[in-house]
Amino acid sequence: MAHESKGLPGLRGTDHIGITAPDFDEAADFLENVLGLVPFYQMGPFGSDDSDWMKDLLNVHPRAVIRRVRHYRCGHGPNIELFEYESPDQRKVMPKNSDWGGHHITLYVDDIDAAMDHLRAHD
């Protein structure tokens, strides 16, 4: 049965989800050694001392610097993009799920009990 969409033409799915972590190394360790995600691309640092391209393209402070960004494969779902930012106006309070910008990611596993045991063992 064909479904006619009024949405974005040619939309096929989600490619990646970007996350800015307060501690890049700790987040990378969790993604790689607890979840088992596979890193496949890294770049950085980059920013600008003399233009507003960070503000214009990424909606961050013009002098913000992306220290590192690393992409991870996550099974057959969207990839995870991990960021480490440094910015003069950076807020360092984690949003609650009810706050604007609050979020969560749900993973699909074959055995929820085995997955929970694995996560608890790495707590």
Q: Could you describe each region identified by the protein language model?
A:
Residues 1-8:
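Basic/polar N-terminal segments that are highly enriched at the extreme N-terminus
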Residues 90-91:
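Short loop/beta submotifs within extracellular cysteine-rich repeat domains
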Residues 20-77, 114-117, 121-122:
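Core segments of cupin and vicinal oxygen chelate
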Residues 12-16, 100-104:
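Short, solvent-exposed beta-strand edge segments and adjacent coil->beta transition regions
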Residues 18-20, 106-110:
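Short hydrophobic/aromatic beta-strand micro-patches
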Residues 96-98, 115:
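Long, charged/polar, surface-exposed segments that mediate recognition or autoinhibition
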